[in-house]
Swiss-Prot record:
Organism classification: Bacteria, Pseudomonadati, Pseudomonadota, Gammaproteobacteria, Pseudomonadales
SUPFAM superfamilies, alphabetized: Ribonuclease H-like (SSF53098)
Organism for this UniProt entry: Ectopseudomonas mendocina (strain ymp)
One Pfam family, short name: RuvC
Enzyme Commission code: 3.1.21.10
Gene Ontology CC annotation, any one: cytoplasm
Gene: ruvC
Cofactor: Mg(2+)
Catalyzed reactions per annotation: Endonucleolytic cleavage at a junction such as a reciprocal single-stranded crossover between two homologous DNA duplexes (Holliday junction)
Protein's recorded name: Crossover junction endodeoxyribonuclease RuvC
Role: The RuvA-RuvB-RuvC complex processes Holliday junction (HJ) DNA during genetic recombination and DNA repair. Endonuclease that resolves HJ intermediates. Cleaves cruciform DNA by making single-stranded nicks across the HJ at symmetrical positions within the homologous arms, yielding a 5'-phosphate and a 3'-hydroxyl group; requires a central core of homology in the junction. The consensus cleavage sequence is 5'-(A/T)TT(C/G)-3'. Cleavage occurs on the 3'-side of the TT dinucleotide at the point of strand exchange.
UniProt cross-references to Gene3D superfamilies, sorted A to Z: Ribonuclease H-like superfamily/Ribonuclease H
Amino acid sequence: MTLILGIDPGSRITGYGVVRDTGRGCEYVASGCIRTGDGPLAERLQIVFRGVSEVIRTHGPVTMGIEQVFMARNADSALKLGQARGAAIVAAVEAGLEISEYTATQVKQAVVGTGAADKQQVQMMVMHLLKLVQKPQIDASDALGIALCHAHHRQSLIPHGLASAKRRGGRLRL
């Protein structure tokens, strides 16, 4: 059983979701949002870093999936999003997690079955797949979707030789 962390990065709200991949499916472990407030960007990035670090310490995932930066119409927003991603990635690297990146389309395809799904469809499928009674916050459900996508992609690699890959320095090398 593998614990997987999913991160939906943002400079104001970063969603996180932790699932347990049992090999026969995924089970819900935890989810939530790291809220940074309206302070200076450097302080908000520190909050993202510390928040992700705390989630990793608390739940002990060994691998992380994170959403890739999309091309936003507003360059300033895209840069801030990229910096928030960087803060989350550094927290994961410092904890020794293996990291994979997924586009929003890949996540929607893995969770809903279509890359054209909206956030509410992802949220409903996350609830169904993880047998959740209450709706998670939208950023947390996106993060859980990223974790489910990561679990799906990890499983699809196993028949193609990943199981025979050699471990070097604590990281899988193909």
